[in-house]
Regions:
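Conserved internal helical-beta-strand scaffold that buttresses enzyme catalytic cores
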Residues: 1-186
């Protein structure tokens, strides 16, 4: 039920975004601006229009709709890690405090369960990748946003600055950060 409620809220935000962007938070504007046509159709409730007008079986429609829905869920999860990943960063080497549960970073919040982990999703070039399994995506998100360094940048109002930081975070391999190559200014 919570997932449907979240999706309804996102659909309402999207409707408002289409009417008047000024009433929407900049983070959501950025998210909606980046949506593919298929994901936008899903948010508008036009899932029947996601498939081309070729005569395809309802089974194919169902699979394509599920793929699109999972891809949208993956994009929501990426957005959540960009906003709140720093809250889960490993900043306590002595482990003196217990790591808090962050619902926004839980795939179940977006309707992703254990059965979905091996499903491929389209993430449209994020991390230089177009398609990836949800399990692999979560691994990358954890590595980039929840490692030994926490990065908080989504509050920055200037989209150009925010995109620059995001590009720097998401286009360096985490394993290279502290190598000689990784320390060089890019």
């Amino acid at each position: 039920m919570e997932v449907q409620s979240n999706l309804k809220k996102i659909q309402e935000l999207y409707k408002e975004y289409k009417i008047n962007k000024k009433n929407i938070d900049d983070n959501w504007i950025s998210f909606f601006d980046d949506l593919t046509e298929e994901a936008a159709d899903l948010l508008e409730g036009n899932s029947n229009h996601i498939i081309s007008n070729n005569s395809q079986s309802s089974n194919n429609n169902s699979q394509d709709n599920e793929y699109t829905a999972n891809s949208l869920r993956a994009r929501l999860l990426i957005r959540a890690y960009r906003i709140a990943g720093h809250l889960k960063a490993d900043l306590d080497p002595l482990e003196l405090t217990e790591q808090k549960y962050i619902p926004d970073l839980d795939p179940k919040t977006y309707g992703i369960d254990d059965n979905d982990m091996e499903k491929e999703v389209f993430i449209d070039g994020v991390f230089g990748i177009n398609t990836i399994t949800i399990r692999e995506l979560i691994g990358i998100l954890e590595k980039y946003y929840c490692g030994k360094i926490g990065v908080q940048f989504m509050h920055i109002q200037d989209k150009e600055q925010r995109d620059w930081i995001m590009d720097k975070i998401e286009n360096i391999k985490p394993d290279e950060i502290f190598t000689k190559k990784g320390k060089q200014a890019s």
